[in-house]
Amino acid sequence: MKYTLEIQKLLLQAQNKNLHPREKANLLKEAIRIADENEDVEWATEMRLDLIYELNLLSADTEEIAVFSKILDDYENHKDVIKEDDLLWKYKWIWSSTFDIPEIPMEQVEAVGEDYKTRILRNGYSLRSYYQRWSVECTWMRQYDKAKEYIDKMLAEKMDDQSCEACELNFMLDYYLETGKFDEAYSRAQPLINKQVTCYEANLRAYLKLAYYAQKAGKPDIAADMCTRAEEALAGREKDEYLLLYMGLFIAYYLMTNPERGWEYAERCIDWSLRTNTLKKYRFSCDMVEALKYEMRPEVHLALPE
């Protein structure tokens, strides 16, 4: 079948590691279009799941949700070729994305969460990932008592294939760091620091925020160690714009210790902030307000996008 060769050619191009996620997304969209034209629902679904990964790197939440809605529609109409279980990991991402879009009312966010909950239960999973997501949201909203309740509920559930131990631990650090429990956070972070548990971004995110909070806690040696680890992990990830959410406090750390390096990162991140979603733009702005407290010079000169 000629169309399969066309798709394979596009997918081969998308494997180029030098491509920006936006370029990969465009190649996947074209491949999906061809699959749809030829009514290859199974292959189109696989590629849409891959597309969601690339869109996630671009913080393209609204588009992610639209793509996943199509996947769910196809699942309902083609349960003979699409397994619901194969969709649930990305569904967790999509539910997370709904929290980040102010235009989506909380009632709808909760409804998506309940639907996700129903689907994971009927596929034999625990509620661990469901409670974990709520713990993250409550921490971000500074509802720390509720966050701790959800953390406790999460830990009481069994670990399964909908869970990521490294990501869970990374997000738990936010609760302990933001409530002033640095020593406990640092102790709990050891599996991430020593790479006993790993994930694509969880270890790096831990280094970034621990550098800032260690410096604030009067522990410069720990802060310097976390900074070194972060710099090593950031090498080669200059295109990972989704890291914006975690870079602001790292910039703040550098403005306390090495302002020139901090502003180098700021130049990169300000460019990213012009293309990201509303939540990340807001949180980066808040972190930069914090960072500016440590810049003593009345004026700095930056190379910014036009």
How would you name each of these model-derived features?
Residues 1-11, 24, 44-46, 87-92, ...:
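Generic helix N-cap/helix-start motif at coil->alpha-helix transitions
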Residues 1, 6, 10-18, 300-306:
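Long C-terminal extensions of eukaryotic subunits of large macromolecular complexes
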Residues 8-16, 30-33, 42-60, 86-99, ...:
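Non-membrane alpha-helical segments in proteins
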Residues 54-55, 137, 175, 213, ...:
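TPR/TPR-like alpha-solenoid repeats
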Residues 17-30, 58-74, 100-115, 138-153, ...:
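Helix-turn-helix repeat elements of alpha-solenoid scaffolds
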Residues 273-306:
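C-terminal non-catalytic interaction modules
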Residues 32-40, 72-81, 114-125, 152-163, ...:
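Solenoid-like repeat scaffolds
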Residues 118-128, 132-133, 142-187, 196:
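Alpha-solenoid helical repeat scaffolds
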